[in-house]
């Protein structure tokens, strides 16, 4: 009579090592047929849709290399070049051991770091200089560019002095200079408005003076025409012969021509202080 087979015993039967045929003889005494040359070794698992047959030409790809299971000896070694490049130039060595005697296999990964302080200290690498890399590299490049912009701002604010490295001091200087420039711009704008108003008033005065000049010029031409018409003699004009006058008469106003005039009375005659004696009033 055969012994009873529990679930653990059956699972151990299914997880046998095919490379060692000696284990098959241990279970033949119980009447269990475990021949591997049959077409369907596990009919119970096939009914559940599980395929446990190994394809001879099946090739798996791990990273940049390909693994041929037909010639696989159980140990997989990865070269350091196949491991992704790390920020701190970490050389990784991974060793994967697959045990075919177990159901899922065991995977073992070993990593060796050349620099233990790499995770704590951020060193300058070549990947950061090319603009790529991790978030730490991008953040470092951003800070470097920001520091350069602050240095340029400090040199622009104070050209003759050494650029400052204190960012709050640079920002304070920039705010102060901007406020000063804003006040100067407002003052210049007010001055410009005043000058524009003065220019408008001067233009109005200029137009008024131009009109007055035209009026005066017209009056001058009119006066000249009148003078020319008064002084110009007519074609049939005969000069008047002055009348005879006494030689002791002289002209008072030369412009009036020589007209007979009496001499001035002497001072003794014009004295009226003794008129009562010399010339008594008529009775």
UniProtKB/Swiss-Prot annotation:
Residues 96-134 are annotated as: Disordered. It comes from the Eukaryota. Keywords: DNA-binding, Nucleus, Transcription, Transcription regulation. One of its GO terms (cellular component) is nucleus. Residues 107-120 have a biased composition (Basic and acidic residues). One of its GO terms (molecular function) is protein dimerization activity. Residues 130-181 form the bHLH domain. The keyword tRNA-binding does not apply. It is found in: Nucleus. InterPro entries: bHLH_dom, HLH_DNA-bd_sf, ILR3-like. Homodimer. Interacts with BTS and BHLH47/PYE. This is Transcription factor bHLH104. It comes from Arabidopsis thaliana.
């Amino acid at each position: 009579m055969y012994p009873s087979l529990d679930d653990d015993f059956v699972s151990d039967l299914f997880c046998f090592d095919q490379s060692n045929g000696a284990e098959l003889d241990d279970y033949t005494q119980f009447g269990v047929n475990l021949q591997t040359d049959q077409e369907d070794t596990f009919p119970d698992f096939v009914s559940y849709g599980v395929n446990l047959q190994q394809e001879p030409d099946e090739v798996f790809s791990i990273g940049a290399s390909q693994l041929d299971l037909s010639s696989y000896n159980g140990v997989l070694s990865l070269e350091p070049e196949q491991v992704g490049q790390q920020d701190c130039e970490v050389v990784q060595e991974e060793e994967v051991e697959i045990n075919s005697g177990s159901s899922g296999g065991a995977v073992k990964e070993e990593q060796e770091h050349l620099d233990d302080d790499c995770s704590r200290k951020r060193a300058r690498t070549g990947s950061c200089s090319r603009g790529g890399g991790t978030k730490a590299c991008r953040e470092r490049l951003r800070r470097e560019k920001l520091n350069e912009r602050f240095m340029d701002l400090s040199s622009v604010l104070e050209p003759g002095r050494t650029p400052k490295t204190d960012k709050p001091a640079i920002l304070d200087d920039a705010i102060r200079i901007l406020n000063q420039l804003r006040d100067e711009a407002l003052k210049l704008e007010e001055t410009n408005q005043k000058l524009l108003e003065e220019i408008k008033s001067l233009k109005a005065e200029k137009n008024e003076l131009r009109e007055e000049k035209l009026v005066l010029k017209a009056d001058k031409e009119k006066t000249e025409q009148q003078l020319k018409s008064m002084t110009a003699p007519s074609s049939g004009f005969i000069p008047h012969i002055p009348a005879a006058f006494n030689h002791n008469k002289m002209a008072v106003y030369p412009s009036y021509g020589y007209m007979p005039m009496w001499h001035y009375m002497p001072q003794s005659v014009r004295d009226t202080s003794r008129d009562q004696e010399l010339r008594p009033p008529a009775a």
